[in-house]
Each structure stands twice: as C-alpha cells, then as structure tokens.
Amino acid sequence: EINKSLDGILSQEGIHIRQWYVCPHARKDRCQCIKPNPAFLIQAARDYDLDLRHSFVIGDHPHDVLTGEAVGAFGLYLLTGHGPKHLDELPQDNLIFHTLGDAAGWILKHPNAERDITCDIQLGAEAIRRGGLVAFPTETVYGLGADVFNTDAVARIFEVKKRPLHNPLIVHVSEQRQVKPLVTNISKTAQKLMERFWPGPLTLVLPKADIVPDIVTAGNPTVAVRMPANQWARELITLSQTPLAAPSANAFGRTSPTTARHVEDQLHGGYDVLIDGGACRVGIESTVLSLAGGMPLLLRPGGVNQEEIVEITKAIEIFHPQNKTGKRFESPGMMLSHYAPTTPLRLVDDVAPYANRSDVGVILFQNSAICFQSPASVLSPGGDLREAAANLYRVMRKLDAMGLSLIVAQRAPDNGLGAAINDRLNKAAVKSPPNCQNRA
C-alpha cells in the first residue's frame, strides 16, 4: 500500500517507477528508526547502468540522505515520518521539502541537481550586480534581495512588495567582516552574539555608518544586519560582491513565503531571478535584537529563543507593538498587523467550539482528541515547537486557499519558539473584523 501511494504521488509529478527494490535495514546508533543499507543503490545502478552522480535519493532520515550522498547521489530530505525529529542531525546545506510531491517537482526542474543550483545562484548574482532583484531561500523565509548600495534597486523592492518606506530592511551578509563598513561600532556584546548565533536566524540592530543608504534604514540612525545560515543564500551574497538588502519575498503584510512556489504565487514575477532552494528549515523570521541603546531590546521574537540570548546579554527588554509611538520603525516585524492571510484569523486557547463549523479552518498546535468536522491542520503532531514553527506559514496558506469564512489558531506554549509562533499569529489576527473574531 505504501509503495502504491508513492507510485501515485510520483506519477502525478511525471516520475514513473520502473522497479522497486527491497532495502535491507538495520538499527544503529541512538535512534530507534530503521536505517537502509546502501547496497540497494549500488544494485540499482548496476541493473540500469545508472551514474549515481546524476541520481537522487529522497529520504526522511539523515541516514537516507547521507547514504545516498556517500555513493555519489544528490540527497533530498523530507519533513515527513522521522524527518522533523532528526532535522538537527542534517547538514545545513541539504535541501528539505514538506512533501514527496514537492521533492519530485524540484527534481524535474533541476535534473542536474547541484549544477543547476549553482547556475541559478550565478544568474542571481549577475542580476544583483546589474541592479536587479533576486528571490532566494534562507533558513527563515524566502527573501527578495537587492544590492544594499543601489538605491534604485532597493526602491524597486518597496514597489514590488507595496511596502511603506518607513519600514526598514534587513541587510544580509555572508561573512562577519562585511558588517564593519556598515556600522560605526560593534560592541563586545554584539561580537559575542555573532560568534554564538551566526550564521543563523538572529538580526542585530547596530548604529549605522553613513555608507548605508537611508532608504534601507527608513532614515533611522541604525541598521539591521544578519548572516543567514542557508548556504545558497551566503553563496549568492558572496558572488554578488555586496551585502543584500532583503525583506521577505511576499506582498507586504501578508503571510511569509517558505517555498519558491509561495514566492511565485504572491509576487507574480516581480523579480529577475528566483532561486528554488526547497523549504525553509526554520520557517519563521529571524529574531531581531537592538543593541543601539543601553539595555538590549528584543524587537521581534524569532528563530533564536529569548532564553538563549539572555545567556549572553544577561538581561533584556521586550518591545511591545501597542506601545509604539510615531511612524518610524527600527526594524521589520514591529507593526501591529503583519503575516496575515486573506481569510480573517483568530488566535484562541480553545478550538473546540469550532469543531463542527465547515466554514472555519482550524490550526492545531498538536494532535487533539477532538473529532473535527471542520478543515483542521496540525502544526506538530507531537507538540514540537521547532516542527510547529516550520509548518506555520505553510498551514496558514493551505487553509487560506480553501475559501473559508474564518481561520482559528490554537495558541502555542509561550516559551522558546512558541513565543515567536504566537507573535506571528497575534499579528496575523489584528486585521480580522470584529464580527469574524466573535463568531462561534
């Protein structure tokens, strides 16, 4: 039955199975998962005269992917089955996908695998140097990037996204040394945070140097900087020979994109090059921390937990959007309303009253004993915050496309990544009209 299901999924994408191999398995190391033996790959290569260097291995355990790569194949990782549980064991440069269909679709578009990705990155870098816009993957969400020093290109980002000019952009670098020309000072605390969390989902707001155009910083005396963990993003920045100013690659205020298809659906070609790097590993935006004043100020929760930051800073203040005065923002993600689907959304503690509403979509944090007649999607069956964060925007988009009258989301535990999940859902719910929020 499993093989039949896989056959059907792959056939829909245009990939047809010629033969199934029985794969020898063995239990190893700390994990109770059953691991394949590479012998079946070598046997398949002999039977069909395959060059494994031009072949693909798709699996939901790091062992699957690394086994394939060990014999020369290109590995694709699925966030199904054991996938979420073992994601931390997977090297950062491996591509990940939410479904087998997504992985199959990527293979058909990139038959030469790494060579095709390299070509896309080179085309992207050439576009950046010409003053163009490139949509590219990071570990958080897909970004829409331009040369930070090209004001015309940066202005086009605001135009394509319909983004207000008072909302600044994050500058992305591929090496720490690229930060120094952008700022007037790097404090000891900033240096420690960079060493601990970079490359990774932490943005630091620092005093800006005059070389950074005001359009990037919305006229603020500070600049937001981060180094993405995604290998392809850093390679794009390096080949572009400039830091990139890059917000999320979506229409302003709407749900952020975590796959290339999400970018296509929202921006409709408002870019010169789109680099398809699979699904985003973290799935929500970076944490933003301002070090421009006295006490470190958390402007936006994100991929790095507040608890982890405090281990270095010792103390921290929290920004609350409702206390904001004036129109200027020090970084992205500070507005009251953001990340919203087109369908009204409400954040609740108890989703049970909506269980029998066919016109209401339900976002569950984890598996529930309630039997839902309404469309329901689970962020993490086992209640894992990391898995829930990675699925959040995908699930929001899925329910948003169903023509529902309302989406209700179950609040996550407010610790670790849960704070970032609830922040996104709270902001996505702000624009929901009162009559939608109060229906039950």
Where are the predicted features?
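Hydrophobic alpha-helical segments with strong N-terminal bias
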Residues: 9, 21, 326-328
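Active-site-adjacent structural elements in enzyme catalytic cores
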Residues: 112-440
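Short low-complexity, flexible loop/linker segments enriched in glycine and/or proline
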Residues: 1, 91-94, 260-262, 424
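Conserved residues at the C-terminal ends of beta-strands
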Residues: 23-24, 58, 79, 99, ...
